[in-house]
C-alpha cells in the first residue's frame, strides 16, 4: 500500500455516497462502537483512542463533540481533507493525520483503545499492521476490529455479486478492475477476505488475552426474535454451533484485550 495524492475513483465513489451524511445520522453507529468497547473496558475523557482508517472522520469528530479523546489515521489525502472540512463545520479540529498503517510508527503502549472499523480488508500486509497495533496498545488496551467475512453470501465490498468473497483473490481483483477501473488496486480493493476462525487464531497468536466475538457482543436486550435469542443461547453452550453460525455472517467483529 502507498499514499496516493492523485484523485482515485474509489475514493470519489465513497465521498459521493458519504460526504454529505449528517453527523446526527451516525449517532447510532457511534453509540454501538462505544457499547462494544464498553463490553470489556470503561471509556471516559482520559481514554486515549486511535481510529485507523477514518473515512469521512465521523467517529473521531463525534468523540470530540462528546468530550472523548480520539485521534485518527487515514491513508487517503482526499478523505483527510473531507474530515477536516466536516470538523471545521462543527467548530473543532478532526485530529486526523495522513498515514499508512503498514509503515507508520504508532509508538509503544500509547493507546487505551484502537479502532479498525472496516479497514484491514484493504491492508495488503495486514499481519504486520496488526503487530503494530498490538504494540501500540497499553497493557489491558482494547482493539475493536470489524472487517470482511469470506463466506458471507453478500459482501459489502461488492454487493452486486453474491458469494463475491468466496472467489480466489486474482478473480476478485479482476472483477473489481472490470467494474471500477484499474486504480481500484491503488486504493479500495479488498486484499483480504477474513474468517472468524482465522482471525481468532491470529489475535491469540499475537498475544491478546481475551478475544470477544459478535455472539458475545450482541445486544440481547434489543433482540425480540425468539429464534435469534435461542440461537444465541446455543452459541453460548457450543463452540461448534457458534463457529457454524458465525461462518456466514456478513462481517467479522471482534473486541480484543491485550
Describe each PLM feature range.
Residues 125-126, 156:
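Conserved catalytic-core motifs of eukaryotic protein kinase domains, centered on the activation segment
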Amino acid at each position: 500500500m502507498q499514499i496516493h495524492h492523485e484523485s482515485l475513483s474509489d475514493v470519489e465513489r465513497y465521498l459521493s455516497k458519504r460526504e454529505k451524511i449528517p453527523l446526527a445520522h451516525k449517532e447510532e453507529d457511534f453509540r454501538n462502537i462505544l457499547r462494544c468497547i464498553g463490553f470489556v473496558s470503561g471509556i471516559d475523557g482520559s481514554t486515549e483512542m486511535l481510529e485507523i482508517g477514518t473515512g469521512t472522520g465521523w467517529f473521531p469528530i463525534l468523540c470530540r463533540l462528546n468530550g472523548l479523546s480520539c485521534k485518527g489515521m487515514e491513508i487517503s489525502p482526499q478523505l483527510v481533507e473531507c474530515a477536516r472540512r466536516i470538523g471545521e463545520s462543527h467548530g473543532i479540529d478532526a485530529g486526523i493525520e495522513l498515514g499508512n498503517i503498514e509503515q507508520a510508527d504508532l509508538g509503544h503502549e500509547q493507546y487505551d483503545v484502537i479502532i479498525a472499523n472496516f479497514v484491514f480488508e484493504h491492508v495488503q500486509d495486514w499481519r504486520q499492521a496488526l503487530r503494530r497495533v498490538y504494540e501500540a496498545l497499553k497493557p489491558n488496551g482494547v482493539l475493536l476490529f470489524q472487517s470482511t467475512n469470506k463466506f458471507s453470501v453478500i459482501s459489502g465490498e461488492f454487493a452486486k455479486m453474491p458469494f463475491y468473497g468466496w472467489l480466489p483473490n486474482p478473480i476478485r481483483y479482476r472483477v473489481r478492475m472490470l467494474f471500477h477501473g484499474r486504480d481500484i488496486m491503488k486504493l479500495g480493493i479488498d486484499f483480504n477476505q477474513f474468517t472468524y476462525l482465522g482471525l481468532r487464531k491470529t489475535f491469540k497468536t499475537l498475544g491478546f488475552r481475551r478475544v470477544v466475538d459478535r455472539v458475545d457482543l450482541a445486544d440481547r436486550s434489543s433482540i425480540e426474535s425468539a429464534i435469534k435469542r435461542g440461537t444465541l443461547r446455543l452459541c453460548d453452550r457450543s463452540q461448534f454451533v457458534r463457529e457454524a453460525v458465525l461462518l456466514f455472517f456478513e462481517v467479522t467483529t471482534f473486541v480484543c484485550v491485550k
